[in-house]
Amino acid sequence: MSQRIEGLFLRATKIKHNSIIVDLLTRQYGRSTFVFTISTKKNQAFLFQPFHFIEFSAAYTPEKKVNRANNVEMKFPIIDILSDIRKTGYALLLTEILNKVFHTEEKNEKLFVELEKMIISFEHRPFNAVF
């Protein structure tokens, strides 16, 4: 049964001209891997960037290492982080660190909510090296 899942982008690997494997930190399941079929007409590849929170539909099966997903949407826009090169650098660094830190598929909703708050705060505040 398909359900809506929220996730924070960690890493992506393009496998075909229209498919991409994405590692996400999800609110419901912890770190998970999904395959998305992306449409070049809709420019969906833009959604898979550091600090992007996305929401999508998937029939999640814990036994599978990779699940298929579709109907991807950005949860909230991240504009200032992408337009400020200093913030973009921090986003790339922190996304890489998060990718290395989260190995297990354990659900940790508190951590997900705190990361979400931190990223929203980073988006809306002026750049400060010690945010």
Predicted region positions:
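Non-catalytic alpha-helical scaffolds and adjoining flexible linkers that form interface surfaces
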Residues: M1-F131
